[in-house]
């Protein structure tokens, strides 16, 4: 069984991005209308997105925010491009809180922890933990996040300044809600939301990156 958090193996990752960094302008998508569900999302130039494909549930499109959390975004993008998220799962699900996943399917993979980009750790991060925000999961150690992330299915302000939000859902909150409803039927312990039967954990088929940022190196 996967542990709640992947093994911490090294010092925090320092990222030097060659892309221009811009903050996110917008708000999380709260409701998919029936008319919009089947239409492709219009990706904007200058922004970077992640498409989380969840088997039997659908796709969650997330706009990433390198201007607010550059280290978290670049780490997430790198891991996605390496295929680390293929066949990972959402293993912890709580209604009125979040869905958590992203531990590598291969337990032998060792990942480098990154700096926690949040106020309590000395970083300015303007992303609040409202419904639709994606954020890095971690242990009680500030600089311990690796691959695991969570998506808020409700506003959760007590996390503000304590965890590194790095993007928000722009399409697919209906998928997040469906995963939440399903997960609450299979959690072994309502208190922590863990789904201990791995065969019942929703599977992340893959996470693909749509990077429309303009390189500053011309």
What spans do the regions from the language model cover?
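Cyclophilin-like peptidyl-prolyl cis-trans isomerases
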Residues: 22-218
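Sec-dependent N-terminal signal peptides of Gram-positive bacterial secreted proteins and lipoproteins
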Residues: 3-26
């Amino acid at each position: 069984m996967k542990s709640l958090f992947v093994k911490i193996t090294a010092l925090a990752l320092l990222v030097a991005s060659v892309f221009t960094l811009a903050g996110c302008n917008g708000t999380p998508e709260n409701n998919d209308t029936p008319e919009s569900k089947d239409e492709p999302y219009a990706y904007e130039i200058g922004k970077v997105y992640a498409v989380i494909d969840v088997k039997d549930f659908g796709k969650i499109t997330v706009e990433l925010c390198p201007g607010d959390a550059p280290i978290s975004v670049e780490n997430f993008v790198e891991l996605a491009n390496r295929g680390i998220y293929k066949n990972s799962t959402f293993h912890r699900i709580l209604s009125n809180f979040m869905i958590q996943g992203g531990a590598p399917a291969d337990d032998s993979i060792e990942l480098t922890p990154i700096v926690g980009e949040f106020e309590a750790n000395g970083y300015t991060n303007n992303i609040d933990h409202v419904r639709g925000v994606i954020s890095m999961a971690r242990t009680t150690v500030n600089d311990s996040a690796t691959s695991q992330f969570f998506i808020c299915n409700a506003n959760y302000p007590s996390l503000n300044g304590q965890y590194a939000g790095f993007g928000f859902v722009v399409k697919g909150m209906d998928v997040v809600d469906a995963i939440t409803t399903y997960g609450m039927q299979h959690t072994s312990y309502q208190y922590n939301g863990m789904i201990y039967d791995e065969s019942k954990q929703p599977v992340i088929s893959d996470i693909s990156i749509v990077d429309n940022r303009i390189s500053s190196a011309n």
